[in-house]
Amino acid sequence: MQAATVVINRRALRHNLQRLRELAPASKMVAVVKANAYGHGLLETARTLPDADAFGVARLEEALRLRAGGITKPVLLLEGFFDARDLPTISAQHFHTAVHNEEQLAALEEASLDEPVTVWMKLDTGMHRLGVRPEQAEAFYHRLTQCKNVRQPVNIVSHFARADEPKCGATEKQLAIFNTFCEGKPGQRSIAASGGILLWPQSHFDWVRPGIILYGVSPLEDRSTGADFGCQPVMSLTSSLIAVREHKAGEPVGYGGTWVSERDTRLGVVAMGYGDGYPRAAPSGTPVLVNGREVPIVGRVAMDMICVDLGPQAQDKAGDPVILWGEGLPVERIAEMTKVSAYELITRLTSRVAMKYVD
């Protein structure tokens, strides 16, 4: 009997990379594998994508794990380096790094390195989180071009704040700032992540950085799914029924008795709970698949168990398979029901959930 297990479909992952190449045919791909590849497994994901042009991570530790695991492709530190003492390692491992503040620039100017570092200057075009402000950008860029520790030419990167809102006007403003600054500069350019790839073809430039869409999940909050863009879900969160019980009309279920059956029925108990990372906020009615059939969660999600209403005529039995999201049940639907973003759902699964990779 299988308890909580994430099944990762390598074939779907490779399909998605190819699909994104079709959407951005003139651009190279930075496959973003930060946060344990969005919960899909850092090394296994990178090894499944030998055709990716580079990989993107948020921490130096993630980059070092890739190198230790045999990944030789370029690795981009999307947030840059946090300590000047990391620069020799970045240089020796040939990592690319974002540079977005004065402290990082000064560290590069003062460092003693055997080889120069490939730099992506981060321009704040409107996200207002990381990056050099436009009015300071030319001077900052000039210093990078004069720095002996920076491999030339300097590349330029930015990030959209509202790419998933095509009618708000913010993305056009960011693109205008980005284009103005990049004009006449020889380096590579990148601004499009998942939303930009899907909705803003004029933003694709030299490199795109697919994140959540690489894993078959839509970055948009408009009830779309990855399938709407030709992508396939890579992760399926699965488990099993550990009990099937007769349940009488009028009886409550679970902590607090928040759900009361209106009929005699059969209840299934699933080996899954918030201790595995499934959202405790999932209300009664949230769908799961039992033997490929959609049934509703009833009562509160507990630490280790979820109850589902199988229906009065159900023939399901203990040990039968359950899918909480994934193939046949998009995680975007669970996000909509629980008001927990799909990004959070797939990245917060706990260490007791087993990982299984299939082709």
Curated annotation (Swiss-Prot):
Task: State whether it acts alone or in a complex, and with which partners, per the record.
Answer: Homodimer.
* Keyword Cell wall biogenesis/degradation in record: yes
Which residues does the record list as N6-carboxylysine (modified residue)? 122
Positions of substrate binding: 129, 303
Q: What is its EC number?
A: 5.1.1.1
Family to which the UniProt record says this protein belongs:
Belongs to the alanine racemase family.
| Required cofactor(s) | pyridoxal 5'-phosphate
Mutating residue 164 to A leads to what result?
Slightly reduces affinity for D-Ala and L-Ala
Pathway info: Amino-acid biosynthesis; D-alanine biosynthesis; D-alanine from L-alanine: step 1/1; Cell wall biogenesis; peptidoglycan biosynthesis
- One Gene Ontology biological process: regulation of cell shape
GO cellular component terms attached to this protein's record = cytosol
Q: Name one GO molecular function term.
A: pyridoxal phosphate binding
Q: Which InterPro entries match?
A: Ala_racemase (IPR000821), Ala_racemase/Decarboxylase_C (IPR009006), Ala_racemase_C (IPR011079), Ala_racemase_N (IPR001608), Ala_racemase_pyridoxalP-BS (IPR020622), PLP-binding_barrel (IPR029066)
Q: Where does the source fall among the domains of life? A: Bacteria
Where N6-(pyridoxal phosphate)lysine occurs, the residues are 34
Active site (record annotation): 34, 255
Which reactions is this enzyme annotated as catalysing? L-alanine = D-alanine
NCBIfam families to which the protein is assigned, alphabetical: alr
Return the SMART domains for the record: Ala_racemase_C
This chain's protein is named: Alanine racemase, biosynthetic
